[in-house]
């Protein structure tokens, strides 16, 4: 796709291996991962600064795992409230669904409240670790073009000056109104909700009760959410005929807040803003050297808090693949797996978010009556009720095609699903989360066995070239047995017995775990070599040192 570009030579030219348009959370996450992989990145943002008002309020365990992968989770956690429940209330205040999953299979609380601007700031400051990563604010993309080996962007600077960026790849993280997506003429099909909502953020929380409450009031549904650092968010449906200007008037604001506060005049307003809830999905996530991520690729209603988290999944999925391609360690075909893996799951999360919105504010009054009746019925069906309250209805990603080997496995297979992250014990005696051992790249994890056994030198070299770590998991009581040490293999103790249980459940011995922590393949020691060869070919990995391809590692 080529847009028209002027012939006048601009004053300033920038180069980078990857250009990212948009300094929101998805763009910042992409830049952090690529930065730690040594890739030169230029982030282009049309605003003068990061957005400093609260937007998304829910961050899940998968997103925290992405933060952990780029070394920022300890700075993010102080801006979160873990184990944040979501409670649906009838118009009379009865709680008919108390959703508070207490599982931590990925190492973190499954539902967390957070303050997005402060977490965005953590990611932005994280870029200072990488001298080859730069951000340009107050730059608007006016046009761009791509060839077989590069992308060129024309920018307009803060004082009207013209600049160009030449990059090998472009990632569009420029939001739901993405200029990049529109210029590429990629359809963005979906629906816009007929009703808007007004969001009101208040400092020094005047309510101060924990968790999130969604009141299914047919007159005016509303949401009340406790956020970190003493912030309270209220959301009220905007009724037909009302405008943002009208609702922002003091007497109307007082009327809204009187539904939820005894003294609506004693509040410290941070801001109010009217939102329209959209549910849209891009037809394609990639055209040649341009890729879409986050809201540029999909937008969804807020009711499951998955817009932000879906964007983080995009970034985590795409960043490691792009890093391998840019560094010459994999072919460009690897990037085709990004859409294969992410688009269907994004669609599932959109559908879930729309459904949750219908539970809160049914389009028809009779549907609300049916909802309330079903909520009573669930009390007599404990297994069904637990299914909802533990959020097992949330579509967990399971990739069935892409950068993995399914081998015809069904839904019960862990291939294409995220690997667990329990605590493990190091040989030093320190207890850490598993990802601290895995690092930022691939890991080949074996239960009770040395995963290098039976691999030839060429296979080991090929995978070490992309940073793989070989990890042997043993019962914690065996961690100090030095005779079992294998050169080049890290040993960890199974502190909580979770890894043994995982391998036993799936009747396997070795898991190949990708940088985004998804299982790419399973094997036993005698089949690992063949699996790695097949996976490398599917991912179009570059060939490693094969000089000793027939030499076995004992």
Swiss-Prot record:
Catalyzes the insertion of one atom of molecular oxygen into position 2 of the phenyl ring of 3-(3-hydroxyphenyl)propionate (3-HPP) and hydroxycinnamic acid (3HCI). GO terms for molecular function: 3-(3-hydroxyphenyl)propionate hydroxylase activity; FAD binding. PANTHER family: 3-(3-HYDROXY-PHENYL)PROPIONATE/3-HYDROXYCINNAMIC ACID HYDROXYLASE, FAD-BINDING MONOOXYGENASE. Keywords: Aromatic hydrocarbons catabolism, FAD, Flavoprotein, NAD, Oxidoreductase. Belongs to the PheA/TfdB FAD monooxygenase family. Disulfide bonds: none annotated. InterPro entries: 3-HPP/3HCI_hydroxylase (IPR023786), FAD-bd (IPR002938), FAD/NAD-bd_sf (IPR036188), PheA/TfdB_FAD_monoxygenase (IPR050631). This is 3-(3-hydroxy-phenyl)propionate/3-hydroxycinnamic acid hydroxylase.
């Amino acid at each position: 796709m080529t847009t028209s570009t002027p012939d006048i030579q601009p004053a300033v030219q920038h180069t980078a291996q990857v250009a990212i348009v948009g300094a929101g959370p998805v763009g910042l996450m992409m830049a952090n991962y690529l930065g730690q992989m040594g890739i030169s990145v230029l982030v282009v943002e049309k605003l003068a600064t990061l957005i400093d008002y609260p937007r998304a309020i829910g961050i899940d365990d998968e997103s925290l795992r992405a933060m952990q992968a780029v070394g920022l989770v300890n700075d993010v956690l102080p801006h979160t409230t873990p184990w944040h429940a979501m409670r649906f209330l009838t118009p009379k205040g009865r709680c008919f669904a108390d959703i508070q999953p207490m599982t931590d299979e990925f190492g973190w609380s499954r539902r967390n409240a957070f303050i997005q601007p402060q977490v965005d700031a953590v990611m932005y400051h994280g870029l200072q670790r990488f001298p080859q990563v730069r951000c340009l604010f107050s730059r608007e993309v006016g046009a761009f073009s791509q060839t077989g080996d590069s992308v060129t962007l024309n920018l307009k600077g803060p004082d009207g000056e013209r600049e160009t960026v030449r990059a090998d790849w472009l990632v569009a993280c420029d939001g739901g109104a993405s200029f990049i997506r529109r210029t590429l003429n990629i359809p963005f099909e979906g629906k816009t909700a007929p009703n808007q909502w007004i969001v009101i953020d208040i400092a020094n929380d005047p309510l101060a009760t924990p968790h999130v409450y969604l009141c299914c009031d047919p007159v005016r549904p509303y949401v009340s959410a406790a956020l970190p650092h003493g912030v309270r968010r209220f959301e009220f449906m905007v009724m037909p005929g009302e405008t943002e200007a009208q609702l922002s008037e003091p007497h109307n604001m007082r009327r809204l807040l009187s539904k939820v506060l005894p003294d609506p005049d004693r509040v410290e307003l941070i801001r109010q803003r009217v939102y329209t809830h959209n549910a849209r999905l891009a037809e394609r996530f990639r055209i040649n050297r341009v890729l879409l991520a986050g809201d540029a690729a999909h937008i969804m209603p807020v009711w499951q808090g998955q817009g932000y988290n879906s964007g983080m999944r995009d970034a985590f999925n795409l960043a490691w693949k792009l890093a391998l391609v840019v560094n010459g360690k994999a072919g460009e075909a690897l990037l085709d797996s990004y859409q294969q893996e992410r688009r269907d799951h994004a669609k599932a999360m959109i559908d879930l978010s729309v459904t949750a919105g219908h539970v809160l504010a049914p389009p028809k009054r009779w549907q609300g009556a049916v909802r309330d009746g079903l909520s009573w019925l669930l009390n007599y069906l404990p297994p069904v009720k637990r299914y909802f309250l533990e959020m097992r209805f949330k579509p967990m990603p399971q990739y069935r095609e892409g950068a993995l080997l399914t081998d015809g496995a069904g839904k019960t297979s862990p291939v294409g699903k995220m690997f667990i992250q329990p605590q493990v014990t190091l040989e030093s005696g320190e207890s850490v989360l598993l990802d601290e051992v895995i690092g930022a790249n691939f890991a080949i994890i074996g239960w009770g066995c040395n995963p290098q056994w039976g691999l030839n030198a060429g296979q080991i070299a090929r995978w070490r070239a992309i940073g793989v770590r070989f990890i042997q998991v043993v019962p914690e009581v065996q961690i100090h047995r030095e005779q079992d040490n294998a050169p080049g293999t890290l040993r960890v103790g199974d502190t909580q017995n979770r890894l043994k249980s995982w391998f036993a459940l799936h009747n396997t011995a070795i898991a190949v775990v990708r940088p985004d922590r998804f299982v790419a393949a399973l094997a036993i020691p005698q089949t690992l070599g063949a699996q790695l060869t097949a996976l490398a070919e599917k991912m179009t990995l570059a060939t490693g040192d094969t000089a000793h391809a027939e030499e076995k590692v004992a």
